[in-house]
């Protein structure tokens, strides 16, 4: 399927679909924990970004990413875009930060998406957030390289210097009760 075909299909579709290298993939529903974590991140970022050109988006706005001989369209769980000229109605092309909340069924895919996302020169931070335990993995652009950092304590603070924000793991996981059974 071509890009224009996908965009027309997706606009009329009742369910969300991602577009990768010409293939269309249906998006599965998410758990309660996934939704709470995504909302916690988006709400806190929205509050911190007031008065700046940056805006936080959640789940239903696509991110267009470059790919070999094509483009991909993903639905990040939370995305922050700061370029006012990046204003397509249904997607953003130049996110500064992308968050993916991991689930057992999507973890490998979300980790793999980073290979595509990192081709976007606007992206400064790619953040993977576990919903099983307090754990955040941050990929941070440093020139031509990417630096990795992991946070595992709820008192830890995630510095999002690219957008002038900070999130503690306590804020990210507010309302989540972790159990050994998960």
Where does each model-flagged region fall?
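Gly/Pro/Ser/Thr-rich low-complexity, intrinsically disordered segments predominantly at protein N-termini
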Residues: 1-182
């Amino acid at each position: 399927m071509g890009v224009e075909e996908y965009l027309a299909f997706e606009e009329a579709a009742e369910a969300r679909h991602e577009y990768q290298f010409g293939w269309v993939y249906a998006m599965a529903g998410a758990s309660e924990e996934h939704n709470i974590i995504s909302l916690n991140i988006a709400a806190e970022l929205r509050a911190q970004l007031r008065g700046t050109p940056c805006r936080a988006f959640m789940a239903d706005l696509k991110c267009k990413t470059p790919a070999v001989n094509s483009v991909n369209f993903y639905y990040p769980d939370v995305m922050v875009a700061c370029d006012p000229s990046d204003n397509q109605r249904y997607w953003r092309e130049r996110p500064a930060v992308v968050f993916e909340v991991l689930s057992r069924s999507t973890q490998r895919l979300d980790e793999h998406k980073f290979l595509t996302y990192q081709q976007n020169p606007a992206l400064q931070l790619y953040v993977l957030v576990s919903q099983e335990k307090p754990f955040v993995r941050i990929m941070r652009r440093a020139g031509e390289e990417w630096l990795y950092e992991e946070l595992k304590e709820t008192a830890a603070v995630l510095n999002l210097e690219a957008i002038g924000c900070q999130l503690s793991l306590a804020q990210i996981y507010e309302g989540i009760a972790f159990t050994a059974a998960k």
